[in-house]
Regions:
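Nucleotide/pyrophosphate-binding catalytic subdomain
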Residues: 1-115
């Protein structure tokens, strides 16, 4: 089993990645794709009048501050546009892909960070 993480920064060519994924799947390789979408999320948040906010820890690590509205924007972009876009691209290449989010079946959960 291969777990492939596709980043979400600007400039990613999803068509090239999906071509490779389709080739692996058709060759019999079990595969899970995990994707990002931060660049698109930032753009959509700006368009909706809710620009991203970041906090920096004492050690210098920067994280996105996620309030309820930001979480809704994340859900719209990650679960909607990015996830279903990748599923569509895989389907057109003959891969019977299924798109899930961490909310589906509580696939993953994590503790909330203190800020």
């Amino acid at each position: 089993m291969i777990v492939l993480k596709i980043g979400g920064s600007e400039g990613i060519n999803y068509d090239f990645i999906v071509d490779d994924v389709a080739g692996l799947v058709k060759a019999g390789q079990p595969l899970i794709v995990v994707h990002g979408g931060s660049a698109l999320t930032n753009r959509v948040a700006e368009q909706l009048g809710h620009p991203p906010k970041f906090v920096t820890s004492v050690s210098g690590f920067s994280s996105r501050r996620t309030d309820r509205r930001t979480l809704e924007i994340f859900e719209m972009v990650y679960c909607g546009q990015v996830n279903k876009g990748l599923v569509e691209k895989l389907q057109t290449r003959g891969v019977n892909a299924v798109g899930l989010s961490g909310l589906d079946g509580r696939i993953w959960e994590g503790p909330r960070k203190d800020t």
